[in-house]
Amino acid sequence: VGFLNMAGGYEARSRFFKGCIPPKSVSLVKSEDTPSNECLVFEGFMDFLSAVTLGVTGNADCLVLNSVANVEKAAELLDGYGRIGCFLDRDEAGRRTLDALAKRYGARVADRSSLYDGCKDLNEYLQRTTKKQKNNHLKIEEQ
């Protein structure tokens, strides 16, 4: 699977490969409904796709960093939003990225990682949730 970024490069993923076809940059997915005052920020595309699967994106625009090193590239795109929801990894790099965004945007930034407390990221949360649901379904059918 390949996802286009703002510089014309692609973030590529398969079972065997995770990388970028340069140039590397962020990816912006605009809401199809109406112009949005909210942008949700994700570290990678798998977290973004997990958010879509979980139904947490609503009518917000979504910005995928494709690397926390791209936080400065994201800044100019985020300037126009009144609310910025961050679904970043629950690790040191994710915390540094959240801190950098909060320093620039103040109260407009909201940490949304409490949704997946106990997991490294949103994708891990989705995998655990899906696995639990499958196990519960099997238990119900066995009774």
Per-segment meaning from a language model:
Residues 1-79:
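Phosphate-handling DNA/RNA-contact segment within nucleic-acid enzymes
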Residues 37, 53-143:
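TOPRIM fold recognition
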